[in-house]
Amino acid sequence: MQLARIRRRVARWLAPEYEQELRETRRRLRTARRRLRKARAELEDARRYPPVFPEPLPERVAQTIEAVRGERLTYLKAGMLEDLAGCVLRLERDGVAGVVVEAGTALGGSAIVLAAAKAPERPMKVYDVFGQIPPPSERDGADVHRRYETIAAGAAKGPGGETYYGYRDDLYREVEESFARHGVPVGEHGVELVRGLFEDTIRLDEPVAFAHLDGDWYESTMTCLARLAPLLVSGGRIVLDDYYTWSGCRRAVDEYFADREGFRFERRTRLHVVRD
């Protein structure tokens, strides 16, 4: 053991760049192992539940998913977009009434998929600041604050490494144009883009059939849950985009549903909350 330590010290002294490379390799290996554990856990969770919508996606919806990913309008993988589309297609198949909501849309890709999956007459509201997201609070963990430091420093990147959506000059216009380009124009397809902070804009008084929440932090997630969960119809779903990603979102969800009955959790690739 002593000889091995001496050898390592000599190696560090003779080749410091080798030691730095070794540390970086070990760091990457640890990261890869964490990702593998997470992927395995997500796969096990997904196996516990049948697909929300077991039928093949309509061709138009499948093409929309491919198109928004091709244009890098979303951070979501194809399977996640298929899951969102399936939730809405099931509502249409089963005749479940209610508005479709997306809170936090970034470049609009997932909202465009939801709009393509729903009937044109079903109302849909898309809430976002359409700019840089607000800062986290003391209820968020260190992971969230580190992420926001990156965003605030101007170092965040878009889905393909391009300009981060929060730095765009006129994101609202870009999202509106993307809806039209993909065949679901806002004014003609029952979609309304609502600009502003969630606490100022989410004030519905009608049944909610489905909500995709992508608010990242604690306060935004808690606001969405407090305003939308009581309106969720029987069989309706809330999909939490960031439950497995950011501590603030996870804390808000766990706190909100801790003493509330009538909801069940489905731990799929993302958390689904279903109203009984």
Predicted segments — roles?
Residues L57-A78, A85, R93-D276:
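S-adenosylmethionine/decaboxylated-SAM
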Residues M1-A67, R72-L76:
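Boundary detector for helix-to-coil junctions that initiate low-complexity/charged tails
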Residues L89:
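Internal catalytic or translocation cores that form aromatic/hydrophobic pockets or channels
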